[in-house]
Amino acid sequence: MQVSDFHFDLPNELIARYPQPERTASRLLQLTGETGNIQHKGFKDVLDLAESGDLFVFNNTRVIPARIFGRKASGGKIEVLVERILDDKSILAHVRASKSPKPGNELLLGENDDYQAEMIARHDTLFEIRFNSDKTVLEILEEVGHMPLPPYIDRPDEDADKERYQTVYNAKPGAVAAPTAGLHFDDKLMAALKAKGVNFAFVTLHVGAGTFQPVRVDNIDDHHMHSEYVEVPQDVVDAVNATKANGGRIIAVGTTSVRSLESAAQDAVKKGTELVPFFGDTEIFIFPGYEFQLVDVLVTNFHLPESTLIMLVSAFAGYEHTMNAYLQAVDNKYRFFSYGDSMFITRRNNV
């Protein structure tokens, strides 16, 4: 398939630049993968769509204030966007500058030259940077970093984003983009799902800035996914196995939860074992033709045209069903992308 097969026209005004006043106030497009049937609902209806014995799998990554402004000691402004924390003192980052820093260059980061750092090495498009401070990278980012809002939210970050561009169940710092399907869940909805007999499990996938990179090939077979760190611990494996054994559904909240679970499933197939815990990097690329091992239902936001994420949704619900749902969403003025509305999709078998 061609990347252009996943294009759709999106009016600029449908890109959500701010979240709704309440997390659960978003709209929800329900798509039945088998038939392509569409129903228009509100996000609170997730409670009615869930069944006792279902397992909701959430991504508990925490977004770090990953964007830092500063300058080179030799002069010239720079903007640093953390891609990955390497250790307590070092990061791998994207750097925007009129002239890229070279190994050994001193950087002064923070609006008031708060922290000194050194450019250590370049790895393709990424820069390895080491801080010269008693504080850890996370402490420094919390102090001088900005929330890394996606490029299509064309406004500066605000204090409110520190709460709203974060899920209520975040636990493990490391992401530079939110697992956005989870932004719609508040504590009240989580408690109501629990009361209904729904079970929860938490994977970790630290979303990298690569999630916003455009696909730069024409044929999707030629695309190579960026790498992201994943944790699927033993308790998740146990919960998935128990749910399957009892006839419940695995409901992945977000494409990152899908990629985490399916990475673990692929790893088990490769090793010739049952599902086992998975800790490591994944470059899994899910597009039409992929056979899902674990996930039965997907809760996900509306994604960018020609992105790997709309390809994943097309693999899950069927290409025609997905593109038709997106056209209907545009016609019905759903809000798109990170702060936008959501979908509840049941898997189409043998897509």
UniProtKB/Swiss-Prot annotation:
Its main location: cytoplasm. It catalyses: 7-aminomethyl-7-carbaguanosine(34) in tRNA + S-adenosyl-L-methionine = epoxyqueuosine(34) in tRNA + adenine + L-methionine + 2 H(+). The keyword Repressor does not apply. Its EC number is 2.4.99.17. GO terms for cellular component: cytoplasm. InterPro entries: QueA, QueA_dom1, QueA_dom2, QueA_sf. Disulfide bonds: none annotated. The keyword Transferase applies. It is found in: Cytoplasm. Transfers and isomerizes the ribose moiety from AdoMet to the 7-aminomethyl group of 7-deazaguanine (preQ1-tRNA) to give epoxyqueuosine (oQ-tRNA). This is S-adenosylmethionine:tRNA ribosyltransferase-isomerase. It comes from Photobacterium profundum (strain SS9). The gene is queA.
